[in-house]
């Protein structure tokens, strides 16, 4: 019988529980959130099946026989852009699953449960594919999964199963014999994180937003695949985009790999040959190595065909994919954990999980106390000064007056809060006019580029007016306003801009009350945003001359659109050209017309405007 005395010798695959016909094995969840088998000795007949099925005990013979000496390696994307957006990388799994569904077969993979735990699920309907695709990044329960797969195989229909390398090794042990109608797919696994770790992170997010999480996408593509951003949606309609470098859940895993299962630190399932027919994952490689037609920053898959069966399966999917041979050496170099196990950090595992059981915030406070702070090193400060000088040089050229204006407003203007060493400055191009009341305030937490010119010789003026007690803030990232802009913040009004975006020629922004523009929200040409009607009074019940505007994160304001007073635009929306918007715009929708109406829903789009460094302009 199985007897776990060393937790590093159990991968939590659940195969021993499924193979026991006497139901003598149950799984106990420890303080780390991982499960381990416990044997009821009164039910156990000591038949030894649980030991025979264990992939850890039987590491010497789990490798696939008859495989390629060196796997065939491919870069791959799904032709369906919606599938690619919804996938973790390039949509390889969905292409494989589609081929199986087309033959009325079964597809197995991981799905979220209502409590945000994860289970392996065997599906016979293509409608389940959206739940099955995308990596979940925590350990999944497989109770009953092996039995379900065995029964599906007996029907003679094709079956595809996808899981971690240890789970798929366990599948081979459980089935005992090869099945021609079985396609086994594993993924590149760094190490499997504790379900408790993820649960506490969800609790942390829910406390932060005062609402329950209703949708979670670990790797969202809207801000670019390489940003490793996460999108979380809440019951109160909040949407939170979290960049990888700003995500405590991701950062803590790299700082403290002990969040992963003990067996992950000496994993016998690394490298090649594999137990699977196909291995899939993200194609991380050196810049320029991925063919351009396969790389548009919305995800590219790497696929290893480990044997002839896997290669044949890929060939059957060729109508659904765009693929190209890729260097095996390049692919393995970019995916370190394809070949090597996790390494322990200096942190005490027991202490970490004691803290995690208190709360996720307690872990941040103890292990990453500086997380989210913007304190810069000396090297970074020198880079920031160089960035400022380069930005001013590009804006002013040899124009002494523009140089003086930049120095004055950055170093000697009390109305503008700047700190060049901390990368908080304004870059003023030629033909820009600033009119700041002595009691006005412009608060810069990131670079603000005013009057940027694509046509260098243009004399098109840009204007910024902030009246008495008016306040304008650039909150998070660099914000670029092209030439021809007219920004006016009236007496006592408040304009806040998230940044990490740019707005094209001819912006007309009038703030008399309060306008909030979220991060990664930019605009096309001649966009108008105004929260007031110029003090004109109309005899309509409920009419107000000024009503605040809220534009949330990752919104696309296209050419000549107008945002009227009282408008709220939820995250991810697109405002079509020449639309006039007043009222509420739902998340991830496209609106068009005058007045604007919803014409599309559940639309996701890639934003490149978050790359708005002044030195790139």
Give the location of each predicted region.
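Gly/Ser/Thr-rich loops at beta-strand to alpha-helix junctions
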Residues: 89-91, 114, 161-171, 191-193
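Domain-scale signature associated with acetyltransferase and cell-envelope carbohydrate enzymes
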Residues: 380-530, 552-554, 563, 571, ...
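Iron-sulfur cluster-binding cysteine motifs and their immediate structural context
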Residues: 2-4, 9, 15-32, 36-38, ...
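Short, flexible loop segments at boundaries between secondary-structure elements
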Residues: 183-204
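Glycine-rich phosphate-binding "P-loop"
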Residues: 119-144, 541
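Long, compositionally biased charged/polar accessory segments in the mid-to-C-terminal portions
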Residues: 103-106, 210-381
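Electropositive, gly/pro-rich neighborhoods at or near active sites that engage anionic ligands
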Residues: 49-52, 57-93, 97-99, 367-375
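Short "domain-exit" segments at the C-terminal end of structured domains
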Residues: 613-617
């Amino acid at each position: 019988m199985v007897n776990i005395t060393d937790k590093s010798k159990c991968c939590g695959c659940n195969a021993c529980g499924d193979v026991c016909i006497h139901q003598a094995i149950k799984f106990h969840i420890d303080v780390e959130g991982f499960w381990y088998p416990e044997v009821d000795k009164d039910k156990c007949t000591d038949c030894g099946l649980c030991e025979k099925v264990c992939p850890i005990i039987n590491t010497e013979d789990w490798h696939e026989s008859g495989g390629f000496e060196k796997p065939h390696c491919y870069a791959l994307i799904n032709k369906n852009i919606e599938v690619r957006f919804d996938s973790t990388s390039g949509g390889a799994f969905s292409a494989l699953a589609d081929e199986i569904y087309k033959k009325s077969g079964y597809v197995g993979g991981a799905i979220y449960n209502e409590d945000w735990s994860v289970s392996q699920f065997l599906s016979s309907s293509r409608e389940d594919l959206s739940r099955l695709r995308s990596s979940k990044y925590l350990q999944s329960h497989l109770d009953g999964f092996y039995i379900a797969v065995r029964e599906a195989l007996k029907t003679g229909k094709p079956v595809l199963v996808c899981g971690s390398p240890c789970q798929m090794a366990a599948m081979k042990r459980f089935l005992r014999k090869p099945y021609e109608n079985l396609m086994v797919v594993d993924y590149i696994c760094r190490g499997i994180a504790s379900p408790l770790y993820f649960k506490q992170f969800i609790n942390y997010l829910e406390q932060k937003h005062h609402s329950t999480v209703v949708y979670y996408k670990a790797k969202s593509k809207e801000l670019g695949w390489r940003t490793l951003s996460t999108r979380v949606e809440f019951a109160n309609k909040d949407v939170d985009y979290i960049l990888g470098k700003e995500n405590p859940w991701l950062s803590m895993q790299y700082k403290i790999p002990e969040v992963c299962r003990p067996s992950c630190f000496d994993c016998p399932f690394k490298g090649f040959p594999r137990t699977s027919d196909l291995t899939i994952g993200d194609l991380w490689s050196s810049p320029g190595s991925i063919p351009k037609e396969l790389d548009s920053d919305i995800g590219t898959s790497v696929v290893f065909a480990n044997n002839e069966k896997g290669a044949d399966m890929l060939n059957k999917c060729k109508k659904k994919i765009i693929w190209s041979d890729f260097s095996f050496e390049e692919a393995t170099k970019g995916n370190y954990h394809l070949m090597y196990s996790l390494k322990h950090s200096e942190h005490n595992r027991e202490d970490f999980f004691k803290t995690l059981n208190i709360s996720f915030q307690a872990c941040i406070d103890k292990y990453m106390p500086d997380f989210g702070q913007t304190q810069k090193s000396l090297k970074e400060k020198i880079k920031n000064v160089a960035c400022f000088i380069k930005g001013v040089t590009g804006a002013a050229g040899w124009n002494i007056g523009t140089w003086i204006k930049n120095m004055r407003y950055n170093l000697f203007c009390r109305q503008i809060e700047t700190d060049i060493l901390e990368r908080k400055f304004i870059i003023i191009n030629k033909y820009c006019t600033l009119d700041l009341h002595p009691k006005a305030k412009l608060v810069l937490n990131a670079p603000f580029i005013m009057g940027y010119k694509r046509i260098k010789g243009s004399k098109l003026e840009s204007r910024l007016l902030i009246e008495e007690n008016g306040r304008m803030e650039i909150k998070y990232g660099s914000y670029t306003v092209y030439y021809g802009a007219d920004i006016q913040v009236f007496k006592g009004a408040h304009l806040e801009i998230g940044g990490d975006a740019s707005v094209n020629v001819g912006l007309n922004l009038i703030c008399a009350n309060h306008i909030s523009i979220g991060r990664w929200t930019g605009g096309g040409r001649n966009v108008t945003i105004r929260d007031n009607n110029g003090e004109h009074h109309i005899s309509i019940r409920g009419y107000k001359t000024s009503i605040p505007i809220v534009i949330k994160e990752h919104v696309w304001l296209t050419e000549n659109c107008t945002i009227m007073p009282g408008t709220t635009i939820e995250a991810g929306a697109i405002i079509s050209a020449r639309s006039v918007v007043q009222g509420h715009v739902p998340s991830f929708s496209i609106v068009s017309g005058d007045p604007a109406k919803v014409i599309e829903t559940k639309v996701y789009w890639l934003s490149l405007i978050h790359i708005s460094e002044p030195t790139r302009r």
